[in-house]
């Protein structure tokens, strides 16, 4: 029976490593950094090992069936063995393809929750309005995935928003939302346009994986923390108390602020989350700037300046330029039905990883 022996041996070794990690985890009590690292590694390997368990059973079953078929002393079992062998041969190729994908290097941030920042770019009022439209899209998308949105900062204008930041909490959020980083272009006729001309405007979206304090260490001495009165809707409470918090990381000049929480403590916690994510982003940018152009051209590079998508309202079409994919269902897309596009982007990302491995 044919099967990928090299891959099988690799997976046996991965399973053995996971078993060792589980044993180590049982003996750990106070080393929280190590506990965190082990749990993260085991979570990343969970799906791979689940598929391998089925694959392993089929390989063992197929090999045993072959032995029975080749043993004339066991002729009475040949018919059953042939059925087992045929079942193994039928399922093994598909499982091997799944395992090849699962063996690709995982993005270490895929299982993380995220912080999203949205800003108008070119296009004046239309750009500000589209920031609000995209926020509504993400609210619907999060609802479909049972993710929770928590607004960090929301700065309204007369027609839209000059800035919105929010966190998304749930399972494997970054693995899907990371593809939303970049410049989003909208083409439509503004409500104020008397001659019916189509205007083009853009907004920028940044998606940052939330970083644990275990992963991003910050020296408290490097921080300046300011409090101020929150602006915007909120009644008398907004005007009386300095609940908004702004944290500046002095060595880098990076600033994170939050004013939407119910208390100064809650806003400070959220601002620290944002700061950790922004420091991670700055470190990643520095690292990636040193890499070849190959990585920069990859899907999901997260470059804020990359024009990734066009929303054409007159033609009810949305186009993702990274994969040259168009959907003639912009109306449904704007209601949060974006998984078809996201799944295509994830598949492209996996293809690129596979190509890199093949070329090494």
UniProtKB/Swiss-Prot annotation:
UniProt GO molecular function: translation release factor activity, codon specific
Pfam families assigned to the protein according to its UniProt record, in alphabetical order: PCRF, RF-1
InterPro entries named among the record's database cross-references: PCRF, Pep_chain_release_fac_I, Pep_chain_release_fac_I_sf, Prokaryotic/Mito_RF, RF-1
Sorted UniProt keywords: Cytoplasm, Methylation, Protein biosynthesis
PTM info: Methylated by PrmC. Methylation increases the termination efficiency of RF1.
Main location: cytoplasm
Localisation: Cytoplasm
SMART domains found in the cross-reference section: PCRF
Gene Ontology terms: cellular component: cytoplasm
Modified residues (N5-methylglutamine): 236
Family, per entry: Belongs to the prokaryotic/mitochondrial release factor family.
Function: Peptide chain release factor 1 directs the termination of translation in response to the peptide chain termination codons UAG and UAA.
Official protein name in the record: Peptide chain release factor 1
UniProt gene name: prfA
